[in-house]
């Protein structure tokens, strides 16, 4: 599987998460994963909650729709976003150029 996979139902992302960063951002491709930095620390699920909030805003979907499929206790994660309203430019480029 590549870092970004578009399905009939939505988009699946393989993510390498960088917690405690200076800003929330989609950095780009890193070893076949989409590198995303977030400001939240990796403590008591705060990083996962912040990642879900960030992705819901970036893709314009409800927070409850973003599904953390793998990697709850790991920085390598797999997330499914059903029926995104928009696709951020960094993700669109990976879809257009696999």
Swiss-Prot record:
<dbReference type="Pfam" id="PF02594">
    <property type="entry name" value="DUF167"/>
</dbReference>
<dbReference type="InterPro" id="IPR036591">
    <property type="entry name" value="YggU-like_sf"/>
</dbReference>
<protein>
    <recommendedName>
        <fullName>UPF0235 protein Asuc_1977</fullName>
    </recommendedName>
</protein>
<dbReference type="GO" id="GO:0005737">
    <property type="term" value="C:cytoplasm"/>
</dbReference>
<comment type="similarity">
    <text>Belongs to the UPF0235 family.</text>
</comment>
<dbReference type="InterPro" id="IPR003746">
    <property type="entry name" value="DUF167"/>
</dbReference>
